[in-house]
């Protein structure tokens, strides 16, 4: 996920972006000509766009609120399985802080492997990223008693990743799923979920 992108992948991404923007501009121009302002079709299109913006803003506000609630010191434990079903258990400690509005940081140590780690994630201008790797928030909802349910997804050079989390006051339960993209990395294997739990805050 953190590997440097190749020149071709960057050029490919730029080509897709330019093509997409050009298509969107022509499509919008043609749609505006077919549906002049004030017509029922144009009004419906504007209503859909406004609704989409409102939903994105609501999801972003929910996501920031849920992450802000998790600030503090945590112990964590969990296990993950490779495509062959071999399980590895892990545990550690970390501290979650807010670097700036909408940006968060976790510093900790994996006690099982005796290695330290640092992750930074946040949202800016409607775009989400962790350690400069973009991701999407597919769902965020605030449940009873101030609990949250979140679904995040992203695609890297090695595969697709989905992260589902239940945030409560004294614990966080994460279920992660990874699907490799290449045959060499067992592309035929289905999603193999693995669990991580943030236990009661360190006293």
Regions found by a protein language model. Give the residues of each.
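Edge beta-strand at a domain terminus
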Residues: 163-203
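Bacterial N-terminal signal peptides that target proteins for export
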Residues: 1-11
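Intrinsically disordered, low-complexity regions enriched in polar/acidic and amide residues
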Residues: 45, 50, 97, 151-152, ...
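Amphipathic/hydrophobic helical signal segments and adjacent flexible N-terminal regions
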Residues: 11, 20-91, 186-203
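Central antiparallel beta-sheet cores of small beta-barrel/beta-sandwich binding domains
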Residues: 59-60, 64, 75-164, 194, ...
């Amino acid at each position: 996920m953190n590997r440097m992108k190749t020149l071709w992948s960057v050029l490919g991404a730029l080509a897709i972006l330019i093509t997409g923007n050009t298509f969107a501009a022509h499509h919008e121009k043609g749609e505006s000509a077919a549906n002049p302002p004030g017509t029922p079709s144009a009004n419906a299109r504007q209503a859909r766009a406004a609704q989409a913006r409102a939903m994105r803003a609501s999801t972003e506000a929910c996501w920031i609120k849920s992450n802000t609630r998790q600030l503090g010191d945590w112990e964590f434990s969990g296990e993950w399985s490779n495509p062959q079903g071999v399980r590895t258990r892990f545990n550690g400690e970390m501290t979650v802080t807010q670097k700036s509005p909408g940006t968060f940081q976790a510093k900790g140590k994996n006690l099982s492997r005796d290695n330290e780690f640092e992750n930074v994630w946040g949202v800016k201008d409607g775009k989400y990223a962790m350690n400069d790797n973009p991701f999407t928030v597919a769902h965020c909802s605030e449940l009873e008693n101030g609990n949250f349910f979140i679904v995040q997804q992203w695609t890297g050079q090695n595969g697709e990743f989905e992260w589902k989390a239940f945030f409560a006051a004294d614990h966080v339960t994460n279920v992660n799923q990874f699907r490799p993209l290449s045959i060499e990395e067992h592309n035929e294997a289905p999603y193999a979920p693995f669990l991580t739990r943030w236990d009661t805050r360190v006293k």
